[in-house]
Structure formats: structure tokens, C-alpha cells
């Protein structure tokens, strides 16, 4: 788990930071623009943040609608940042810890094409799951750095489990930003991965799976079901945008 979802600190943001707030197919979409000055007070990277909020009905009965809404935002980001080179998806976290498994679960449903040199019309997609430092003995940052230096992608997409201090956001929000992630967990490096780290455009996808109360982390009793649905929604959205 890494940073909290931006919505946790939204109330402390100035009103003009909320660029747009719309509702589509029962999904609330909030677009925030964070500046370098804001970073000093809320400790979030500067950039564009899109937060999707939804209820049980959307997640369980209308996931196709949720995917369509998500695809619109992802399409905008891909059009802006993907210039035809390799896209490197990085699934942060551990598949063995349910509350930290969103990244690996999403990547498990994505299509990897980077090795298919004969199919020139296919977008080049590479997948990498570094696992946690206590499993590998190597910091996640160092592993990612080696892969980035080898592949030289033109876009990095990080996928990770987030935390939240507001129970209403647990399992019912999704964040997409073009800023990055700071490894706040003690099991990982304290280094951050942002678009400045490797001088490569970067997207970050975060799903809050753990509720932080004081120094305790709790998860929802339906977490496994919700994780399976959301990981499929996110992966399917990317697969359709890249390969359909």
C-alpha cells in the first residue's frame, strides 16, 4: 500500500482546484488540478487527478458502465502521452497480501505484446510486477529502475493499492493521475516514482483497499470480490483501448 487517495484531503483544497465535477452513468467524476504550491501543504505531486466514485450497484450490476466512463479518461491520457513506443505497466504490491494485491491482479488480466516483434501493428505492452522488498531482497525502486533502463518505454503506468482515511471511499473510488506514487510503506524504498524520476510520462492508477484508522489498517469484508471486479474493469478498459 502506498499513498492515500486524493479525495481524503479534498476538503482542504481550495475550490478552484476542483476543475470539474460531473456524473455519468451513476459514476461521480472529479477532476482536480494540483500545483507545485499545493504540494507543500497536502504532500501530493503536481498534476491532473481524476477520482471516480461509485456505489455497490454500479460495481456489481453496472460494471460495463463504469468501464466506459473510465475508458474516456484513460483514452485522453493515452492520446496525450503515448507516442507509439513501449508502454510499461508496473503492478506494485504483493499478490499474497489481499489488501496489497490490486496491482498484480490488474496486470494478471492485461495483454503483454512486447515480445511479439513480428506483429508490427500491435502496440508494444510490457508488464512487470516487482513484488515487495521483503520477498525479493531488492528494493522495488531498484528493480523498476533496471527494467525501465532496459526497455526504455515512452509511457509508464503504475497500478497500486491505495489507503483511505474515509470509510466511504473504501473499495468505492478509483484514482487516475499523471503524477506518480511515493513508496510510503516501510517494506519498500522511500523513493518516489513520478514523471520526473525517469523523465518519462507516467500514469498512476490507485484503488483504496485499506481503511486507515489511527495506526491500524482495516479492509472490507467484501474486499476479495471487489478487487476481482475492479481489476477486471481496469484491465479490460486498457485492453480495449490498446487492442480493439
Tell where the protein language model's regions lie, with residue ranges.
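Short glycine-rich or small-residue beta-strand-to-loop segments that form or flank ligand, phosphate
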Residues: 53-55, 86-97, 127-131
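Glycine-rich phosphate-binding loop
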Residues: 141-190
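C-terminal functional extensions of proteins
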Residues: 201-244
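An N-terminal, well-structured beta->alpha segment
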Residues: 38-80
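A glycine- and small-aliphatic-rich helix-loop capping segment at beta-alpha/alpha-beta transitions
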Residues: 73, 98-115, 173-182
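Active-site rim loops that border cofactor/substrate pockets in soluble metabolic enzymes
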Residues: 119-148, 172
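Gly/Ser/Thr-rich loops at beta-strand to alpha-helix junctions
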Residues: 92-101, 134, 161-165
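N-terminal amphipathic/basic leader segments beginning at the initiator methionine
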Residues: 1-47
Amino acid at each position: 500500500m502506498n499513498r492515500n487517495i486524493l479525495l481524503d484531503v479534498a476538503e482542504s483544497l481550495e475550490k478552484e482546484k476542483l476543475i470539474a465535477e460531473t456524473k455519468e452513468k451513476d459514476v461521480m467524476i472529479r477532476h482536480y488540478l494540483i500545483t507545485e504550491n499545493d504540494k507543500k501543504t497536502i504532500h501530493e505531486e503536481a498534476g491532473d487527478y481524476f477520482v471516480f466514485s461509485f456505489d455497490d450497484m454500479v460495481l456489481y450490476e453496472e460494471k460495463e458502465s463504469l468501464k466506459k466512463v473510465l475508458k474516456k479518461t484513460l483514452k485522453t491520457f493515452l492520446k496525450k502521452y503515448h507516442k507509439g513506443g513501449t508502454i510499461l505497466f508496473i503492478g506494485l504490491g504483493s499478490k499474497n497480501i489481499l489488501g496489497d494485491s490490486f496491482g498484480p491482479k490488474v496486470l494478471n488480466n492485461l495483454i503483454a505484446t512486447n515480445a511479439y516483434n513480428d506483429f508490427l501493428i500491435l502496440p508494444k505492452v510490457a508488464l512487470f510486477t516487482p513484488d515487495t522488498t521483503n520477498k525479493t531482497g531488492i528494493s522495488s525502486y531498484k528493480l523498476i529502475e533496471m527494467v525501465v533502463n532496459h526497455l526504455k518505454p515512452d509511457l509508464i503506468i503504475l497500478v497500486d493499492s491505495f489507503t483511505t482515511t474515509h470509510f466511504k471511499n473504501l473499495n468505492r473510488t478509483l484514482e487516475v493521475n499523471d503524477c506518480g506514487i511515493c513508496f510510503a510503506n516501510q517494506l519498500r524504498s522511500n523513493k518516489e516514482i513520478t514523471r520526473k524520476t525517469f523523465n518519462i510520462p507516467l500514469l498512476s492508477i490507485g484503488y483504496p483497499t485499506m481503511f486507515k484508522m489511527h495506526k491500524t489498517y482495516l479492509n472490507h469484508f467484501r474486499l476479495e470480490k471487489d478487487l476481482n471486479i475492479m481489476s477486471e474493469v481496469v484491465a479490460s478498459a486498457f485492453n480495449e483501448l490498446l487492442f480493439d
